[in-house]
Structures are given as structure tokens and as C-alpha cells.
Amino acid sequence: MKFEQPLQSATLLKRYKRFLADVVTANGEEFTLHCANTGAMTGCATPGDTVWYSTSSNVKRKYPHSWELTQTQSGDWICINTLRANTIIADAIEAGDIPELSDYDEIRREVKYGSENSRIDILLKSNHKVDCYIEVKSVTLLDAGMGYFPDAKTERGQKHLRELTAIAKSGLRAILFYAVPHTGITQVSVAKEIDPKYDLLLKQACDAGVEILCYRINISEYDLTIGKQLPFISKG
């Protein structure tokens, strides 16, 4: 996925109210960015980090600039715009770059499903195999090379696990896809200390047949592409 226009850089001053961040450019201009990330963003929003942002052509937007990437002071690159992951994964599936999700005839996005009024991120359909429901999550919480999800308690994430579990029990294919847009993460696990209920529901989902896939997202200020598969580490 190429960015529509080259990203521009600034230095992060602070993130606040979840959806806003103040930055300063090299020439001293200060302004506010929109932040499309509801998570805690632990380690992704340290004052002094380099922020890469896009600019919308929509003149009606109150905050025309959107925070896309963080370049940390330790050298890691992180895509903090969680809206990007679904597009990257869908594009990679269509291009045949994810072997586990190949040989489907049709890909749909944001399809209503389940008993809790949910929308599945990606639905794959085929004339010769069962439907495949894919829920995409972005992993950006880093600790000593391990990426953890979630980075904050997530009732929405819990709901998605219940929905995927029901899909798997019905005989259809259900996949929890951890996209890893963080160059410092080499493997993925669940953050059970942060959200014990999510950890329990994930175990139940796996027991029901829900599959887990983890793939790195390659990051630059020009584009985002699918990278190599990463291991998921279960911690009992």
C-alpha cells in the first residue's frame, strides 16, 4: 500500500484525548494531528519521537493532518494508524502473498455477521471451500522483542473473539490475524496481565478451532507492505 502523497515529518510534543497529538516541525511550526488509534500506544508516542503524517485534501476536516508512523528515538518504525492494517492484509491476500489464505474466489470487506452485531474485517469466499472469516488486529506493544496484544483492556476485542469462536464452531473457517506494524517485534503473544478475560476467550477460541496468523508489516515513509510470518507464542 503506497501512501497517496509523500509523508511529512515532525517531532512529537504530546498525545492527548486519545485522538489528538501536538507536533512541531523542523522550522518551528506547531500544530495538531488526528490520531486514528484508540489504544494505549505504549512505547509508540514518546515526546521527542519522529512522527510521519499525511495531509487530507478535504478542506472541511478540522484536523487535516493524520498521524501515520512513529520513528522512535531507539530506531524502530511503527505504523500507529490502525485503519491501515486491514487494507494491507486485504491487498496481500489478493496478491497471493499469504499462502494460508490463497485460492479463494472473492474477498469482501466489513461484512455484517454474528449475534453481537459485528462486522468482520475480511470475508473470503470460494466455490470449493468453506467461507473464511478474518479479524485483523494491530500489534504495537513491545517488550524485549515480544509483541503483545492488547495494549489496553478491550471489550471490543473480547466480542470479536466470541464471534470468531461461534464461526469456528459452526464449521466455517475463522482466523485471528495479528498484523505487526512494528520493526522491533519478532514474535507475538497475548497480554494476559492487561486483559485476563481476553486471554481466556482466546484460549477458548483456539480450542474451538480459530486459527492464529501473525505477519510483520514492512514500513517506510513511502509505503506499507506485507512482510514475513512471525511466530505466536502461547503462554499457558
From Swiss-Prot:
Q: Which Pfam families match?
A: SfsA, SfsA_N
Q: Which domain of life is it from?
A: Bacteria
One Gene Ontology MF term: DNA binding
Coiled coil regions in record = none
For this protein, the record's CDD domains field holds: SfsA-like_bacterial (cd22359)
Question: Family per UniProt?
Answer: Belongs to the SfsA family.
Q: Which HAMAP family match?
A: SfsA (MF_00095)
Tell me the protein's name: Sugar fermentation stimulation protein homolog
From the broadest rank down, the organism's phylogenetic lineage runs:
Bacteria, Pseudomonadati, Pseudomonadota, Gammaproteobacteria, Enterobacterales
